[in-house]
């Protein structure tokens, strides 16, 4: 007959061995909350248009300077992620509009559950994407370019760029290599308004959405662990092929153009994207 105490000791040893393991990168110190094991998402169901419209009105009130078309597409992607179980209903939403120059504060962080704008901030793009305005985007390692689409935030760690936030891309072909590329949110000395005055733009990252060092920890702590980040640009390939916002069956160009048109009171929408 087996000794019960010996069996208990073996079971505990097995359990502890399963919990041990190195961080994803050698210099990483992972936060206590580890990312959940991936599960097959349920099929996304198109969100009711009235729900998106009401949420868009709230975001426009909180961020009147943001492009309503960008906010609408971000909300569409958020609704699709909610319907497929990718995130919880109270997940915060960060929106980056890379169609704006780096000299603009083009990052907004929303807490929709409490109807608040938490931050509007500067954010750098990758050196492979352009100078002051990002014009090229990539999902390829070594490109040093920014990726577009919907990201779900994950764990924090401390590495070469200090306190950082890992991102998992939810747009296949556009940002789903973010983790393997080490595309993370972090603070950086080159995200500094003084550089705008001296060189006409912010410094650039190797593809990461880098923030001012003074605010990076606060923003990261508010976005860590299964919140959402939507990165937008007027990029035709992304707007045609992105999947994160496609569950309603409406094209991205139509979503963006309709929101801009509604915000302008029915007048001509901004023509950066031609609706089909």
What kind of region is each of these model predictions?
Residues 2, 134-276:
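Exported/periplasmic cell-wall-interacting domains
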